[in-house]
């Protein structure tokens, strides 16, 4: 198994898979772990090229989804719930569309059928390869969090920004290129399993309008 993963919670409980956003690791879910493990077996993993998961060159959205299926197979999990944020949410949409038999339901947060635009992602991939992660880490707190949240939970902000700063530049760039090519706008209407859609009013990238499109 190429994915680094962590499994927490009571054996025999329903399994929920958590998928991280671009530039973070499965540690991003730590604040939710106590609440979720009260009722679920929680499976977290580091996405391709993130955290302790190795990078294997070019990656696509389909491969990100297939990684999840391979992980479920590796752990002999026939069916699970899934929750992903941003890139992890887009992965969840792919899974709901192309592997519905493996999931009871999917929750997607701060995501879209098409996140951003191709030129922006390709430009970001070039930038991190040339200049390192500092080029995207600068200003990340302002992009990711509202003023009120930064004041209320500075430790969460610091932890996630630390994950971004210490991400592998090539792994990050490869996922940027995957997002540049990923477009499920013509596919989400075919999703037949329940999907919970969560959006943030202050999110400038994956907007409420993007969430409404998924409806």
Which stretches of residues belong to each language-model region?
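Short beta-strand/loop motif that positions the catalytic acidic residue
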Residues: 191, 197-199, 203
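Conserved alpha/beta-hydrolase "acid-adjacent" motif
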Residues: 204-210
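Conserved alpha/beta-hydrolase catalytic His-Asp/Glu region
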Residues: 116-119, 130-190
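Active-site glycine-rich loops that stabilize anionic/oxyanionic intermediates
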Residues: 21-24, 86
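Flexible "cap/lid" loop of the alpha/beta hydrolase fold
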Residues: 90-98, 102-137, 144, 152
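Active-site loop/oxyanion-hole signature of alpha/beta-hydrolase fold enzymes
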Residues: 27-34, 43-83
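Alpha/beta-hydrolase fold catalytic core
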Residues: 1-17, 37-40, 78
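The conserved beta1-alpha1 loop
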Residues: 17-21, 199
């Amino acid at each position: 198994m190429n994915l680094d993963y962590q499994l927490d919670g009571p054996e025999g409980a329903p399994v929920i898979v958590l998928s991280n956003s671009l530039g973070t690791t499965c540690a991003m879910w730590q604040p939710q772990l106590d609440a979720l493990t009260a009722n679920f077996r929680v499976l977290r993993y580091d996405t391709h090229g993130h955290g302790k998961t190795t990078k294997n060159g070019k990656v696509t959205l389909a491969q990100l989804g297939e990684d999840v299926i391979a992980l479920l197979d590796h752990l002999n999990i026939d069916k699970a719930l899934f929750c992903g944020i941003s890139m992890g949410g887009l992965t969840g949409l792919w899974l709901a569309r192309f592997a519905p038999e493996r999931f009871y339901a999917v929750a997607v947060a701060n995501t879209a059928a098409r996140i951003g635009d191709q030129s922006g992602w390709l430009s970001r991939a070039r930038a991190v390869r040339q200049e390192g992660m500092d080029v995207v880490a600068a200003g990340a707190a302002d992009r990711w969090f509202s003023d009120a949240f930064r004041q209320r939970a500075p430790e969460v902000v610091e932890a996630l920004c630390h994950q971004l700063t210490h991400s592998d530049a090539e792994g990050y760039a490869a996922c940027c290129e995957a997002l540049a090519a990923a477009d499920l706008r013509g596919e989400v209407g075919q999703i037949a399993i329940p999907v919970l859609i969560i959006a943030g009013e202050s999110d400038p990238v994956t907007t409420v309008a993007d969430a409404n499109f998924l409806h």
